[in-house]
C-alpha cells in the first residue's frame, strides 16, 4: 500500500511539475546593484578565507623543563645537518639562553638592591631635612614674634615719652646745682678766697730750707749795710726767716695788685739773682747807705741797724749751734726773690 501510494500518478505529476523551471514573471528587472549588497558579500568572503590562512601559534614550553640528552656530539663550529645534530644545537641554545637569563636576573637583583639602599638613605635624609625645616620655621616664628613685641614696646615708649624734657632731667651732670643760671651769680665778697701763706711764694722763708744747703763756697752771703763777718752778718734770706716769727706783722693781710704783679710778672728774676751773686749788692744807689730809700710795701721790713746772733737767739728761740748753722746757710741756686730781695735788686738795677 505504501509503495503504491508513493508511485501514484498524481504525485508523480506534482513532483515533475516542481522540478520544471518556472516561467519568468512579468515584473521589470532591476538594472542597478546596491553597494551594500556587494560590500556584505566581500566581508563574508574575507571572513571565510582568514581561518584558512591563520597558522596555529607555537606553544611556549613551560619554564624549568628538563631537556633531553643530545644523542650526538657535534663540534661547536660545525653546521648541523641531521635531526640529531639539530636537536643538539637546540639544546645548547636553550642552555645558553637560560644562563644569560640567570645572569640578567642576578644583575637586575643587584641593581634593585642598590636602588633600594639609595632610596632608604634618601628617605632618611629627607626626614632629617623635614625635621630641620620644622625647627627653623618654629625658630623663625619665635623671632618674628619677638621682633613684633619689641617694635610694639618701642612705639609705646615713644608715645609715652613727654615731648618737653629739660636737659637737667635727662643728664644729672646738667643739674642747676652744677651750672647756675645767670641771675644766680654770687658776689665776690661772699666767696671765701683762701689766704696764701708767705712760705708758698718764697721758699727761703720755709724752716726746712735752713738744713738743705750746707755748702758755703757756692754762693757768697750778702749782708745788710755792707757788713760781713762770722757773727755780725745776716743775709737777706735769714732776715726774712727771722721776721716771719715776729708777731707785730700781719701775714694774713691780702696782697695788693702791685704785689701780685711783682710775684707773677717778674721776668728778670733769674737774671737779678745771677747779677746779685756775681757783683754783690749795689749800695751806692742808696743815699749814704740808708735803706729807707726803698719803697717797701711788702710784709718784710728791713732795719738798717746790724742784727747780731744774740738778737736772733732771743727772737727765734734757737740754740747756739742752730743759730751758728742758720747764719752760715745760703739760699739754693735759683731761689725765688720775689718778696724780700726782689725789690732790692730792682732798686739796684734802677
From Swiss-Prot:
Low complexity bias spans: 160-175
Subcellular compartments: Nucleus
UniProt KW Nucleus keyword: yes
BP GO annotations: positive regulation of transcription by RNA polymerase II; response to unfolded protein
Ranges where the record places region Leucine-zipper: 143-150
Region of interest called Basic motif, as start-end residue ranges on this chain: 89-142
Keywords: Activator, DNA-binding, Nucleus, Transcription, Transcription regulation, Unfolded protein response
Region ranges (Disordered): 1-118, 152-175, 194-218, 328-350
InterPro entries assigned to the protein according to its UniProt record, in alphabetical order: bZIP, bZIP_sf, Hac1/HY5
A Pfam family matched in the record: bZIP_2
MF annotations from Gene Ontology: DNA binding; DNA-binding transcription factor activity, RNA polymerase II-specific
Biased composition (Polar residues): 35-47, 196-211, 329-340
Induction: By the unfolded protein response pathway. Accumulation of unfolded proteins in the ER leads to splicing of the hacA precursor mRNA to produce the mature form.
Record field: compositional bias (Basic and acidic residues): 81-95, 104-118
Function field: Transcriptional activator involved in the unfolded protein response (UPR) pathway. Recognizes and binds to the UPR element (UPRE) in the promoter of UPR-regulated genes. Increases the synthesis of endoplasmic reticulum-resident proteins required for protein folding as well as components of the secretory pathway.
Protein name: Transcriptional activator hacA
Amino acid at each position: 500500500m505504501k509503495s503504491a501510494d508513493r508511485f501514484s500518478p498524481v504525485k508523480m505529476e506534482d513532483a515533475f511539475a516542481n522540478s520544471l523551471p518556472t516561467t519568468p514573471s512579468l515584473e521589470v528587472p532591476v538594472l542597478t546593484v546596491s553597494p551594500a549588497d556587494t560590500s556584505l558579500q566581500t566581508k563574508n568572503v574575507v571572513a571565510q578565507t582568514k581561518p584558512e590562512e591563520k597558522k596555529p601559534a607555537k606553544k611556549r614550553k613551560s619554564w624549568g623543563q628538563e631537556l633531553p640528552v643530545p644523542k650526538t656530539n657535534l663540534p661547536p663550529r660545525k653546521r648541523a645537518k641531521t635531526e640529531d645534530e639539530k636537536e643538539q644545537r637546540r639544546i645548547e641554545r636553550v642552555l645558553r639562553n637560560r644562563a644569560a637569563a640567570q645572569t640578567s636576573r642576578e644583575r637586575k637583583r643587584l641593581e634593585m638592591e642598590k636602588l633600594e639602599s639609595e632610596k632608604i638613605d634618601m628617605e632618611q635624609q629627607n626626614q632629617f631635612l623635614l625635621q630641620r625645616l620644622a625647627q627653623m620655621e618654629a625658630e623663625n616664628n619665635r623671632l618674628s614674634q619677638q621682633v613684633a613685641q619689641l617694635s610694639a614696646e618701642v612705639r609705646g615708649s615713644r608715645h609715652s615719652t613727654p615731648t618737653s624734657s629739660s636737659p637737667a632731667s635727662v643728664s644729672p651732670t646738667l643739674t642747676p646745682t652744677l651750672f647756675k643760671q645767670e641771675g644766680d651769680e654770687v658776689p665776690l665778697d661772699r666767696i671765701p678766697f683762701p689766704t696764701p701763706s708767705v712760705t708758698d711764694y718764697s721758699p727761703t722763708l720755709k724752716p726746712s730750707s735752713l738744713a738743705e744747703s750746707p755748702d758755703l763756697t757756692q754762693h757768697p752771703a750778702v749782708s745788710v749795710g755792707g757788713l760781713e763777718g762770722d757773727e755780725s752778718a745776716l743775709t737777706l734770706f735769714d732776715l726774712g726767716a727771722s721776721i716771719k716769727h715776729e708777731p707785730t706783722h700781719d701775714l694774713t693781710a691780702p696782697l695788693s695788685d702791685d704785689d701780685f704783679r711783682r710775684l707773677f710778672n717778674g721776668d728778670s728774676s733769674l737774671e737779678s739773682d745771677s747779677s746779685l751773686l756775681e757783683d754783690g749788692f749795689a749800695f751806692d744807689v742808696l743815699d749814704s747807705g740808708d735803706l729807707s730809700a726803698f719803697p717797701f710795701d711788702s710784709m718784710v721790713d728791713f732795719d738798717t741797724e746790724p742784727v747780731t746772733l744774740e738778737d736772733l737767739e732771743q727772737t727765734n728761740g734757737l740754740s747756739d749751734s742752730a743759730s751758728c748753722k742758720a747764719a752760715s746757710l745760703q739760699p739754693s741756686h735759683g731761689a725765688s726773690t720775689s718778696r724780700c730781695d726782689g725789690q732790692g735788686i730792682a732798686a739796684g738795677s734802677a
